[in-house]
């Protein structure tokens, strides 16, 4: 497995975010990168997770020749400052746009393939709202567009009040049981002892997340990009059927749906025999890298 380089990405508001970087066949010389890089991949993790969960697929993409940037979202993973907090949906989108700019600068590629896992699928989809962003394709991995699990109604009222009075007040993420992510013993043990796993987010973050949901309903009005949807049969976090119906209704140029039998939410954690990582690398490899 190809180990990533650990880097810091400085955002326009001064926040420094940790990230994993695999140059693939790209180099730091932009001209050489254009000649050699197979493409560029921005990899977005979920609400609780961080880049370490997805190093296997990041490494495999790099071994296939892609330059891969896998940031830890502000307030999550290796980022200790402002744990669980985001000021607004606009700030989250600005961060992602800045990641894309950095990836294009490092790789020399014009377009960017975006992979969004779980909650990261919501952020990935919202990048299409910004018509100027060079999204070449979209891989949605068990995306959190239609969750089964939600905050209780009474808790939502407290979130709404806190968003006005105390936006940094923390609330539990309602998917804290490791068994919701995987049934693989090795990874269950990992999740139980993962010190970087995010278990709470602020009222401000929850409000920002809710605002990102709006584009899911409006996505059919966007010309779209090639998209692949990867689902787990036994997902306890997202509604697979609603997600499938949503994708099939999109008038986008290319849509693919793959569901893995007996699999659980975090496909990365499935035991040997699951072809998810191979399928992800293969599908991205068939997409044009120009947006």
Predicted features and spans:
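Catalytic active-site module of serine/aspartate enzymes centered on a nucleophile-bearing elbow/loop
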Residues: 256-291
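N-terminal cap/lid segment of alpha/beta-hydrolase-fold proteins
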Residues: 1-33
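Alpha/beta-hydrolase-fold enzymes
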Residues: 117-202
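Short alpha-helix in the alpha/beta-hydrolase fold that links the catalytic acid
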Residues: 225, 239-248
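Short beta-strand/loop motif that positions the catalytic acidic residue
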Residues: 223, 229-231, 235
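Catalytic nucleophile-loop/oxyanion-hole region of alpha/beta-hydrolase
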Residues: 48-51, 77-110
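Conserved alpha/beta-hydrolase
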Residues: 58-81
């Amino acid at each position: 497995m190809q180990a990533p380089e650990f880097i810091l990405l400085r955002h326009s508001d001064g926040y420094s975010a940790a990230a994993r970087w695999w140059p693939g066949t790209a180099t730091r010389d932009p001209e050489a990168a254009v000649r050699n890089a197979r493409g560029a991949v921005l990899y977005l993790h979920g609400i609780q997770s961080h880049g370490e969960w997805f190093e296997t697929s990041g490494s495999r993409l790099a071994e296939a020749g892609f330059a891969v940037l896998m940031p830890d979202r502000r307030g999550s993973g290796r980022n200790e400052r402002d744990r669980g907090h985001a000021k607004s949906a606009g700030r989250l989108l600005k961060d992602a746009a800045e990641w894309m700019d950095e990836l294009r600068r490092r790789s020399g590629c014009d377009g960017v393939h975006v992979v969004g896992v779980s909650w990261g699928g919501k952020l990935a989809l919202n990048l299409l709202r910004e018509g100027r962003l060079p999204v070449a394709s979209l891989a949605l991995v068990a995306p959190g567009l239609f969750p089964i699990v939600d905050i209780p109604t009474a808790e939502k009222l407290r979130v709404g009040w806190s968003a006005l009075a105390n936006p940094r007040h923390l609330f539990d993420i309602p998917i804290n049981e490791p068994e919701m992510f995987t049934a693989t013993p090795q990874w269950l043990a990992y999740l139980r002892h993962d010190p970087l796993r995010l278990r709470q987010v602020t009222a401000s973050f929850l409000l920002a997340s809710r605002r990102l949901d709006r584009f899911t309903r409006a996505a059919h009005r966007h010309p779209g990009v090639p998209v692949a949807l990867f689902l787990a049969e036994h997902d306890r976090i997202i509604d697979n059927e609603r997600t499938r119906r949503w994708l099939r209704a999109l008038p986008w140029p290319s849509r693919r749906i793959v569901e893995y039998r007996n699999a659980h939410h975090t496909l990365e954690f499935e035991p040997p025999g699951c072809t998810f990582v191979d399928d992800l690398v293969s599908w991205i490899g068939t997409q044009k890298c120009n947006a």
